[in-house]
């Protein structure tokens, strides 16, 4: 489904099911080309107040790309998000957010983001960032070193 169609459907108040793309939300969400490909159920943002830990969908100001990243903070004008597999986050104007994930399809079943198991995962994930961050930075440096050593 094309980016403009996803946004159009959600802004029209319709929910959609979509395969995720990219690696920024691993290990929760896997790319459509990965053996563990993940589908998500997106709902319009119409009457939902986003909470810390939710996964909104927004459009990047710089290139129009659609992004799913976890909400880590907010204020009156902005949402602050970060991918689960990312070190840094982004500041997103509220008007750029138009939907959010309510269900995740993996291993042959749907998992609601309201379920106790998912909420426990979010709690652990959010509070473990300061432990995971140095490990992610180390992994990035090792990947750069490996690419340099093999000449890519």
Locate the predicted segments by residue.
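Extended hydrophobic leader/signal-anchor segments used for secretion and membrane insertion
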Residues: 1-152
């Amino acid at each position: 489904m094309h980016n403009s169609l996803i946004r159009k459907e959600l802004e029209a108040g319709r929910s959609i099911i979509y395969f995720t793309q990219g690696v920024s939300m691993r290990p929760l969400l896997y790319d459509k080309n990965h053996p563990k490909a993940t589908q998500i159920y997106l709902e319009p943002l119409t009457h939902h107040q986003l909470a810390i830990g939710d996964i909104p969908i927004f459009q990047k100001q710089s290139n129009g790309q659609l992004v799913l990243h976890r909400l880590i903070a907010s204020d009156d004008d902005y949402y602050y998000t970060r991918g689960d597999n990312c070190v840094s986050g982004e500041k997103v104007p509220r008007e750029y957010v138009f939907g959010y994930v309510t269900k995740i399809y993996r291993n042959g079943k749907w998992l609601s983001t309201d379920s106790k198991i998912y909420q426990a995962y979010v709690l652990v994930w959010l509070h473990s960032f300061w432990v995971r961050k140095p490990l992610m930075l180390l992994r990035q440096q090792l990947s750069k070193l490996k690419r340099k050593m093999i000449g890519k």
